[in-house]
Amino acid sequence: YSKIIFENNNMPTLLKYESISDRLIILEGWSKTYCMTGWRLGWSVWPKKIYDFANKLCVNDHSCPNSISQYAGIEALKGSQEEVIKISKEFEKRKDFIYEKLNSMERIKCFKPGGAFYAFPNISDTKMTGKKFAELALETHGVAVVPGTSFGDSVNDFIRLSYANSIENIEKAIYRLSKI
């Protein structure tokens, strides 16, 4: 998601913090930035002390993307980045829309996302856990959201919504969620 950032934010890099370099793993790929989900291309940075282990793990798990994917990835990097900028601007419009709509709901509070295409609102005022809210949203309103606990126990009263969809569909989903 490092290229899908909003409001002139710069993507910070943890590589500049030497004090954590011995336990820092960075993963990046082409999936989101270049709309190449499923092509299975990416890169990583590992600490020297676990590099050999990581290399053994990766070589047997995911080290052989096909040549078509590799050439497409090279072209994505070498080519014009105008489409990446265009897509990022579209996601920014959707972010502004979903942020405004979520915060207009009586029992939902949402911070403005700084990048990517997910909103992560706090739903604690609904008196439901994120898991219960997600189940209810899907079963009774046909809207799929992810409970916050998928990202750790400390966000039990949050949900994650994707805004990688049209404004029209986002509006329909928010309307349905407002009925919960």
Predicted regions located by residue number:
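PLP-dependent class I/II
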Residues: 1-180
